[in-house]
Amino acid sequence: MSVTIEDIIKDLELEVINKGKNVNEINVSDINRPGLQFSGFYNYYANERVQIVGKAEWSFLDAMQPDLRKKRLEKYFEFDNPGTIVTRGLIPHKEFLESAIKNKRWILRTNNISTRFINRLMNYLDVKLAPETRLHGVLMDVYGIGILITGESGIGKSETALELIKRGHRLVADDAVDVKQIDGVLNGTSPYITSGMIEVRGMGIIDISALYGLSSVLKTKNIGLVICLEQWKKDENYDRLGIDKEYMDILNVPVRKLKIPIRPGRNLAVIIEAAAANYRYSLVSDVTPVDVISERIQELRKEDGGDE
């Protein structure tokens, strides 16, 4: 993924003071404040980043003699960069504009103060530049846990999601889930076209927000647990104690995965609710039901006079 300065102008509503010749792709979410460059130091200059000129940099330039300021700015604008953004609505110096126009560099402006704008810009770039993929499944918010329900087509993922929605949980995406990895966290959302919709075989497409209210649909959710629905296999050795832990790799992030075999009479919605509650409990406690059972066995052995 990449972003251009024109994307930033549009999405962050920036004022264009001077239009540059090149529209360079931005591939990093970090920014640079060119105070050192204005002083003439160009070692380790990160000119591939968006440049931010705030009150400190502006005041530094303002304190210079015009001839020196012109010299320093001509040197600065000789280097190509995606664009320079002036914050606080500051008016660029005459030498600043002349050098930018001469070298055909992008100069933009925002009325935001530097700190707030930098946070906003870096968050924007983090999202835009994050690694992403599209997965087949249903993403639900169950008890505050983002659960990705996977399984082969026709196994009942959407029907299970519909039952969960009836029980008060929220839909994020059905059938196609767009996933981005931001700082090791997987964030899932729905493609725009299918947002708020569920496809149920035999009924067609259902508008969840229209039938169950806007609160039944969530725009985005971090993925904490993957539940894979599969047909019951007689010879499969399913985990009965919760000791064996399996993970699914999504964009190089391991996510806890549970296999739920489907069999007549099993209430999948209730099982998924229990899985979500159990996962949430595991985040705050290291004690598992197996630990509790082991302690009880030890207690019974002691009562019977055995300590082994």
Curated annotation (Swiss-Prot):
UniProt binding sites for Mg(2+): 158, 199
A single MF term (Gene Ontology): protein serine/threonine/tyrosine kinase activity
Stretches the record annotates as Important for the catalytic mechanism of dephosphorylation: 261-266
UniProt-annotated binding residues for ATP: 151-158
InterPro entries the UniProt entry points to: HPr(Ser)_kin/Pase, Hpr_kin/Pase_C, Hpr_kin/Pase_Hpr_N, P-loop_NTPase, Ser_kin/Pase_Hpr-like_N_sf
EC number in record: 2.7.11.-, 2.7.4.-
Reaction equation(s) it catalyzes: [HPr protein]-L-serine + ATP = [HPr protein]-O-phospho-L-serine + ADP + H(+); [HPr protein]-O-phospho-L-serine + phosphate + H(+) = [HPr protein]-L-serine + diphosphate
Alphabetical UniProt keywords: ATP-binding, Carbohydrate metabolism, Kinase, Magnesium, Metal-binding, Multifunctional enzyme, Nucleotide-binding, Serine/threonine-protein kinase, Transferase
UniProt region (Important for the catalytic mechanism of both phosphorylation and dephosphorylation), positions on chain: 198-207
Active site: 136, 157, 175 (proton acceptor), 240
Cofactor(s) essential for the protein: Mg(2+)
Pfam annotation, one family: Hpr_kinase_N
GO BP annotations, alphabetical order: regulation of carbohydrate metabolic process
Function of the protein: Catalyzes the ATP- as well as the pyrophosphate-dependent phosphorylation of a specific serine residue in HPr, a phosphocarrier protein of the phosphoenolpyruvate-dependent sugar phosphotransferase system (PTS). HprK/P also catalyzes the pyrophosphate-producing, inorganic phosphate-dependent dephosphorylation (phosphorolysis) of seryl-phosphorylated HPr (P-Ser-HPr).
Annotated HAMAP family: HPr_kinase
Domain description: The Walker A ATP-binding motif also binds Pi and PPi.
Similarity comment: Belongs to the HPrK/P family.
Record's miscellaneous remark: Both phosphorylation and phosphorolysis are carried out by the same active site and suggest a common mechanism for both reactions.
Record's subunit section: Homohexamer.
Name of this protein: HPr kinase/phosphorylase
Source organism per UniProt: Clostridium kluyveri (strain ATCC 8527 / DSM 555 / NBRC 12016 / NCIMB 10680 / K1)
Name of the gene this protein is made from: hprK
